[in-house]
Amino acid sequence: MLELLLFALKDLKMALKSQDSDLLVGLGNAEDIVLKLVKEVQAGLIFTEEEVEYRLRNVVANVESSLSNGSFSWGSSPKIVAWSAPLYDYKNLKEVSTSHDQFLKTKLPMATPLAAATLPALNLGLDTGSVPTLEELKGFLKDSRTPEDNWVLLKNTSARSILKKMLSQKKIKSNTTLSTTSDDNIEDITMDSGTSGRKIINSMFASENSLEVRGGTDITLDALAAYLRYLEGTGNASWQELHDKVRLAETRDGASFYTLFGPAIQLGVISRRKAYNDTIQYEKDRNAGFLSPFGYSTPTVKAAVDAICLMEWYWLLALKSQVSAEGNYPTRIWRWKGYLVQYTFVGNEGPAVLLVHGFGAFLEHFRDNIENIADMGHQVWAITLVGFGKSEKPNVNYSELFWSELLRDFIVDVVREPVHLVGNSIGGYICAVAAGLWPSLAKSLVLLNSAGSIVPNYSFVPLSEERRTSWLSRLQAQLLLLFLRSRVEGILKEYYPTRTERVDKPLVDQIIRASYDPGAVTVLESVFNFNLAIPLNFLFDSFGGKILVIQGMKDPLTKSEASVTMLREHCSKVQIRELNAGHAPHDEVPDEVNTLLCEWMKQIEVKPALEKTKAI
């Protein structure tokens, strides 16, 4: 992404210079650089794009605070004005429905792209700086790192690669042959894109190994034109190269658009408006100026429209969460691999705890745990996994390894210290995978009615291979989604056998709301491809740390008695607590679970403190 950013900045600087203007480039603290620039040009207004990410909103807030505390010879401090370019022409964001189904019924008009503005000449004699080289930028980032950033290197190797290495070292057999189109291979190609591989003259890509379109607006729009015309064939060498990349990036039907153009849209090289407008115009040109009511005429047009509208929807949800009070806890947004992820943080001091929900749920499923655990002296983080709740639901292959990398990066980039990992259902299994692959990230592991199984004397651990889903699995997912919407309240009450009143309207409404989100069917498809074949006891052994299992014994999804028996027989170091509850004990009997969790973490935290005291 760094090299793509530099390509975009170079193009922008050239475009501005062609209008006798310029791009000012600086490396350093945003508050200091902006304050210095404001004083040099005596600015009265500062325009900035409206951001949804917590980190970027924090930067803008710090700049605004710095300006408000500054003194300026020409009078009052400058004002910060936020601008945005939404795809839909809405009047009041607070009135926009968070239900995608209801949102579509309003039939909001699409906003058209704005023409490029004519800028006044820059005649201030400023030192505009130069776009740094990739090596200079990497050096700056390296020098800016704090001790907490040393974990960043953990992100360089995929979960699949680590797992394969662990199996090899322990001499455990596995089906280690991977298909050439798996996500792991795609990741290996795109990791550090542009830093390896031969550069191609007049290529739309940073290197022959890159899958992301590089450069400025003209190159990106040319690449989009080539993408839309994928089925037409071409003698243009650069277009042929892009068509080759489409085949590599199409790991799922329609997935290639985001892989190729997602970074360019995220960097603002082209807007979602422009990409959507050009796509629809091409479709109209193919159909005598009309849009067919029966769907789009080519798979690339459909892929582009679906991806752009999906990105826009989750940007709207994220932005609305920042301007409206939603839920019981403050919502923050983190961008992971380009996807928008919701999370919350409560607490001022104490050990860090990360709560991970189960399939179909979201961070609010810990509604009566977060604040109570924080009040008992903990810093509590809760995340909504990609694919669930109001986090983005991209067109990707979902798996336990995919989500484990999400947890790894969240701990490394956001929490920035080891956590007590607490997970329910599939979230528990994902926590176990993360702890098993990256033990240094977890202080302890707590599983609440976790998915996964115990395999005595495991000698073979299969690695699931990503495979393209069939039309049948998609049809099954659509039918299952319809069934779940109609039965969600009844199903949930079966999961809360001792306190069915906990299945209230807010919980049911949020689950139904998420089921209408674009991408929801894709997530449900993963159910038919899930292969939670890595034994829990293998992951426990790999983790080597303290583990607590809290089991609701009336869980209709699992045979709790048999599960507990297997744990006691084959995982002697695991502590077990049985509760009179169902599949989600943390929400069915939150007070009991909160007490168990806090006692557990207190016990874990006391031992290092005692060891430290003895050392002194």
Regions found by a protein language model. Give the residues of each.
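Serine-hydrolase catalytic-loop signature spanning alpha/beta hydrolases and amidase-signature enzymes
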Residues: G350, G358-D368, V380
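Glycine/tryptophan-enriched, flexible segments
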Residues: E95-A318
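Conserved hydrolase catalytic core segment
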Residues: V414-V461
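Active-site loop/oxyanion-hole signature of alpha/beta-hydrolase fold enzymes
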Residues: P330-W336, Q342-F345, D375-V422, W438, ...
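Catalytic active-site module of serine/aspartate enzymes centered on a nucleophile-bearing elbow/loop
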Residues: C571-I616
